[in-house]
Amino acid sequence: FKANLVTPSEKNTMRAYAEQMAIPMLSNQITNKNNSYFGAFKDNVRLCSLGTIMEGMASIYFCTDSEDLKKILFKSMSIGNYFLSKTQVKTGIFAGGLPNSANWVKPGVTPNASVIRIDNVQHVASGWLKFQKILDITGLY
C-alpha cells in the first residue's frame, strides 16, 4: 500500500477482503496447549500449507489498520512458528529441513511424509521472514 499503486477506494476494498480472509484461517488454528498439534490448523498438518497460511497472515498484518486484528495475527503467527520449529528435522544431513507432514516421525505414516521439498521450505521460510519483520517493527525481536 505504501507505493500508492492503487486508489484509496481500491485499498479499502483490498484491506476489507484481507481482513475477511483472516477470520476463517484464525478460527481453524489449534490453540489448546495440550494438543500435540498446538499452533497448527485443524485437519491440516502439512508444513507447506502452514507456511502458506503464515505468509498470508503476515501479509494481512501489513495491510490492516486494526490493532486488535494485528494482536490476534501476531499471537497466531507466534504459535504457528512454535509448531513449525517443533516439526523441523533436528539432526543429520537434513537438519533444518521441513518435511511434507508434521507426522513424519510417527510410525505407520505414508513414506512421503518425511520427504523434504523445496516448496515446503520456501513457504515456511517466507512466512518466518515476514514474521521476523513484524517482530522487528514491533520491537519484539
Predicted regions and their residues:
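Glycan-recognition and catalytic cores of secretory/periplasmic carbohydrate-active enzymes
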Residues: 1-141
